[in-house]
């Protein structure tokens, strides 16, 4: 259950920091696995949520409310998709995307990627790759197949007029922060268009974090469906499924999706991101780790994967001892998903801390 041999009990957060029950402060480079995009207790966000709690929390999906209108207005400043479905998590956003693709095309086949991660509900889990997540829940949803990530020839062979959709992460997070190649993303777009299939881009982890609102913008292609979650609500559970086509009303739904509190959380989060230009600034906060034990540093902006030659348990532990919380993506990749409010200077401190730990532990046992 824990990354750490000694599991922390976190009791409060402020900005980029969290504190444990012993009063120790840590730089939080996990941010709830990429969720606390504005950091902890951002004053403007907290005040807006407090006001909403005192006003209206739930209304039901059959009603409109001003918080939804406010959210849509803010969202329209970043993207121009025509339709939006709101759920309560990233995996729900993916479930909706898969259902919409089958509804719209009338086809059943979904093509996903080797080493993909899209969530743990049954449809999203069927698109996810790792057997360890899936084996105890089989049989899963039929109609899914996986092709090697970044393999154009495999995509050409797999995508056909039987395909409803291809689903892909612009950067595979869970498998080690591996960016898609430009030629691969372009091929997916061209191949799906050629056969009338849809392209679903899963931005649950990459969204907001890479220097652009959507990481797919780096590839200069336009997907048919985009899924978002994690940081879009800054801690309030939200999932968004964005499309340029409509589906028949009543074919999918959510009791809590689109509630006033969630809509307000998204609206405030987007407004702060826009006013403080945090998404744009993220592209200049990427750090490169220079150490013999490191093979490479991957990712974009504030989605960073540091690939080690050996397993990284001892480095994760020692960084915690020195006041830095980091995540992992496999046994040899250290993953950083800090709040976007972190400064460039602090990211340089993080770089020095990681390099210092590597240097001090050089030659020790994992």
Curated annotation (Swiss-Prot):
Gene that this sequence comes from: lysJ
Pathway noted in the entry: Amino-acid biosynthesis; L-lysine biosynthesis via AAA pathway; L-lysine from L-alpha-aminoadipate (Thermus route): step 4/5; Amino-acid biosynthesis; L-arginine biosynthesis
Localization, UniProt: Cytoplasm
InterPro entries: AcOrn/SuccOrn_fam, Aminotrans_3, Aminotrans_3_PPA_site, Class-III_PLP-dep_AT, LysJ, PyrdxlP-dep_Trfase, PyrdxlP-dep_Trfase_major, PyrdxlP-dep_Trfase_small
Lineage start: Archaea, Methanobacteriati, Methanobacteriota, Thermococci, Thermococcales
Keywords, ordered alphabetically: Amino-acid biosynthesis, Aminotransferase, Arginine biosynthesis, Cytoplasm, Lysine biosynthesis, Pyridoxal phosphate, Transferase
Family affiliation: Belongs to the class-III pyridoxal-phosphate-dependent aminotransferase family. LysJ subfamily.
Principal subcellular localisation of the protein: cytoplasm
Annotated coiled-coil segments of the chain: none
Binding site residues for substrate: 120, 254
Binding-site residues for pyridoxal 5'-phosphate, renumbered to this chain: 90-91, 117, 202-205, 255
Any Pfam family matching the protein: Aminotran_3
Subunit structure: Homodimer.
SUPFAM superfamilies in UniProt: PLP-dependent transferases
GO biological process, one term: L-arginine biosynthetic process
GO CC field: cytoplasm
Modified residues (N6-(pyridoxal phosphate)lysine): 230
GO molecular function, one term: transaminase activity
Protein name: Putative [LysW]-aminoadipate semialdehyde/glutamate semialdehyde transaminase
Enzyme Commission identifier(s): 2.6.1.118, 2.6.1.124
């Amino acid at each position: 259950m824990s990354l750490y041999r000694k599991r922390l009990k976190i009791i409060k957060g402020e900005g980029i920091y969290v504190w444990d029950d012993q009063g120790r402060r840590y730089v939080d480079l996990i941010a709830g696995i990429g969720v606390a995009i504005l950091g902890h207790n951002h004053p403007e966000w907290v005040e807006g949520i407090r006001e909403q709690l005192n006003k209206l929390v739930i209304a039901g999906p059959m009603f409109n409310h001003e918080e939804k209108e406010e959210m849509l207005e803010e969202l329209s400043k970043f993207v121009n998709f025509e339709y939006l479905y709101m759920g309560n998590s990233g995996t729900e956003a993916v479930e909706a995307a898969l259902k919409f693709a089958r509804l719209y095309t009338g086809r059943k086949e979904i093509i996903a990627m080797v080493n993909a991660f899209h969530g743990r509900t049954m449809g999203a889990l069927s698109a996810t790759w790792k057997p360890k997540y899936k084996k105890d829940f089989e049989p899963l949803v039929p109609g899914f197949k996986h092709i090697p990530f970044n393999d154009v020839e495999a995509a050409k062979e797999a995508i056909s007029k039987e395909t409803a959709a291809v689903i892909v992460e612009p950067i595979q997070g869970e498998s080690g922060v591996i960016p898609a190649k430009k030629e691969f993303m372009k091929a997916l777009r061209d191949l799906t268009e050629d056969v009338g299939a849809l392209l679903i881009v899963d931005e649950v982890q990459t969204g907001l974090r890479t220097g652009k609102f959507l990481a797919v913008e780096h590839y200069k292609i336009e997907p048919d469906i985009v899924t978002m979650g994690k940081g879009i609500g800054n801690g309030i559970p939200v999932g968004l499924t964005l499309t340029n086509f409509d589906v028949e009303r009543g074919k999918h739904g959510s009791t809590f999706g689109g509630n006033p509190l969630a809509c307000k959380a998204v609206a405030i989060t987007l407004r702060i991101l826009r006013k403080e230009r945090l998404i744009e600034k993220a592209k200049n906060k990427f750090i490169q780790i220079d150490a013999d034990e490191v093979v490479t540093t991957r990712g974009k902006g504030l989605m960073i994967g540091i690939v080690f030659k050996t397993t990284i348990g001892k480095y994760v532990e020692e960084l915690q001892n020195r006041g830095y919380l980091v995540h992992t993506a496999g046994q040899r990749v250290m993953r950083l998903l800090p709040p976007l409010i972190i400064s460039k200077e602090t990211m340089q401190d993080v770089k020095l801390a990681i390099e210092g730990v590597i240097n001090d532990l050089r030659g020790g046992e994992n």
